[in-house]
Amino acid sequence: MDGAASVCYTDGSIALGGKTVLKSTPGFWQAMDQLLAHSKIAIDRPRGSQHPRYPKMVYPLDYGYLEGTSAMDGEGVDVWVGTSPVNGLDALLCVVDLPKGEVEVKLLLGGTEGETQLALQFQSQPPLMLALLVRRKETPSKKDSTESGSSQ
């Protein structure tokens, strides 16, 4: 389907070549917000630090996990944290790590467009590790921030 046009619908679904390829369940993003609201973020790999097993890989953003949660690898749910003053959930990265035989979902919080791309590049190390970026249509906290900012 190279060259096929993609369409994003108001319900958040995405179609490619006329076929729906991505659609979220109603309430999905709100459930993610609830998980975040009840979890503390622990940063164990600050921006600029080296990966413990691959020293040439340097973390472009703060990277950590949500305390009290569990991901597919048995560890806490992974998070990338950007520098935006509004720290809402912007997107997800679905990562396939072929050498480990793992698939994980990583949360992107408060990232600028450039920071989102940095996290995507870090997680995409073809051909062994590949990532899919799933953007949130609108981050509620950013919408609220914009609305409150306009009334001042």
Task: Name each model-derived stretch.
Residues 7, 12-149:
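Hydrophobic N-terminal alpha-helices or hydrophobic patches in metabolic proteins across all domains
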